């Protein structure tokens, strides 16, 4: 619309302008989408996609003007539809706007997953279990603290995603071929930014250096990296879910994951943690996409990065994967987790890790002796302290109460 209005005085007729605007409106309304067959991964820095759009718009405009498709002397995809713009500003600007929109779509799904973990944290807040470091018994904690921990580490990532997404609001529209603005009408860039702000309601800004912005794709690198950060934490969480739910008889078995399907074609009754496994694999894919984005991002040469199409494809795909993954993990796993409270308390009762609470009272050396003897004999720490007359039963009950050891 801005291009049409600014070019009308000597490069477009009113009839051409109105037809182009009408054709664009139809595409926005969902029509003619079958006329966009090109793959997102393409050579030419997005020229294929840009000209696909220009040609569809031009041909539809021709029909609205009463002409045949291809009669470009009446409405040209290059001279008229592409007036005042280039692939090298229109394409990346569209990517920026699309990615910011996808970012806004992603956040609620992550927030809902975080809320689900918080809900389980509250539900399990009074269930005592054993904490572990390096897979070895450490000190008691609550199962609720485990799930609140999951929620907290994911909550931190929302700020990182928001910070990375802000860069999408800086665009190079009006830069045309390499950032010099050649072939664009005077004032075109500023009017475009004003129109984009009005249409989106976002604080879209024109880059302060259009030459630099035209070759720079670091906003995609940054957002792909932010998504990778989320996936690193999602992998830790899903690995913990699988390990803590292992069993049912010979594993940790602190809680049960909802059963989704028979786990084996040969072992009756086996149930696998398929939903955390799905999220793990989604995370691997998103992390792989981030590597692709990084490699393509460093491929910029001179005044343009011809590899931006695959960067965009990876980022859009990663957002969609995460949205589906977050929802699947929340609905089909986290919401249905059931704690095995007796099993959790049994672990604490038989653990040697509770001896850590004795350090301030009997010292590290004596505590170590008790721990070693408990490990060698199978006798509980509680009983050994009583047998050696180190503390009274009343003193022990106070010190070794799991509830008192949880801060």
Positions of the model-derived regions?
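Alpha/propeptide regions of enzymes that mature by internal proteolysis
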Residues: 11-19
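Internal maturation/activation junctions in enzymes
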Residues: 17, 23-26
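Catalytic-core signal marking the mid-to-C-terminal active-site face
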Residues: 157, 208, 212-216, 220, ...
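Internal glycine-rich alpha/beta core junctions
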Residues: 48-87, 105-121, 139-293
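Mobile "lid/hinge" segments at catalytic clefts and subdomain interfaces of large enzymes
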Residues: 71-102, 106-123, 318, 325-342, ...
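Extended amphipathic alpha-helical scaffolds
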Residues: 28-45, 162-175, 398-400
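Intrinsically disordered, low-complexity linker/loop segments enriched in Gly/Pro
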Residues: 121, 127-130
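Short, small-residue-biased leader/transition segments that mark boundaries at the very start
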Residues: 1-8
């Amino acid at each position: 619309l801005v291009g049409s209005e600014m070019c009308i005085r000597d490069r477009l007729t009113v009839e051409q302008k109105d037809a182009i605007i009408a054709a664009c409106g139809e595409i926005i309304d969902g029509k003619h989408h079958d006329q966009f067959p090109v793959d997102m991964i393409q050579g030419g820095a997005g020229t294929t996609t840009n000209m696909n759009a220009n040609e569809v718009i031009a041909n539809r405009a021709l029909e609205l003007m009463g002409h045949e498709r291809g009669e470009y002397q009446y409405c040209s995809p290059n001279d008229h539809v592409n007036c005042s713009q280039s692939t090298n500003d229109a394409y990346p600007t569209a990517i920026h706007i699309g990615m910011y929109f996808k970012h806004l779509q992603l956040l609620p799904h992550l927030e809902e997953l975080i809320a689900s973990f918080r809900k389980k944290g509250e539900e399990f807040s009074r269930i005592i279990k054993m904490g572990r470091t390096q897979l070895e018994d450490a000190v008691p904690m609550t199962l609720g603290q485990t799930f609140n921990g999951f929620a907290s580490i994911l909550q931190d990532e929302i700020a990182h995603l928001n910070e990375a997404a802000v860069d999408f609001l800086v665009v190079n529209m009006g830069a045309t071929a390499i950032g010099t603005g050649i072939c664009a009408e005077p004032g075109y860039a500023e009017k475009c930014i004003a129109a984009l702000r009005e249409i989106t309601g976002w604080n879209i800004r024109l880059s302060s250096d259009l030459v630099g912005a035209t070759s720079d794709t670091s906003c995609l690198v940054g957002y792909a990296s932010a998504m990778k950060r989320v996936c690193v934490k999602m992998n830790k969480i899903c690995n913990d879910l699988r390990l803590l739910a292992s069993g049912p008889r010979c594993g940790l078995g602190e809680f049960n994951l909802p059963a989704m399907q028979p786990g084996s074609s040969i072992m009756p009754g086996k149930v696998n943690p398929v939903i955390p496994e799905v999220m793990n694999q989604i995370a691997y894919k998103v992390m792989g996409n981030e590597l692709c984005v990084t490699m393509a991002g460093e491929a910029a040469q001179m005044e343009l990065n011809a590899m931006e199409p695959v960067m965009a494809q990876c980022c859009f795909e990663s957002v969609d994967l995460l949205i589906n993954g977050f929802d699947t993990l929340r609905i089909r796993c986290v919401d249905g987790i059931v704690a095995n409270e007796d099993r959790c308390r049994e672990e604490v009762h038989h653990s040697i890790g509770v001896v850590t609470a004795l350090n301030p009272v009997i010292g590290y050396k004596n505590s170590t002796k008790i721990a070693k003897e408990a490990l060698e004999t199978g006798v509980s720490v509680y009983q050994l302290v009583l047998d050696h007359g180190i503390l009274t039963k009343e003193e022990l009950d106070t010190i070794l109460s799991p509830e008192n050891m949880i801060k």
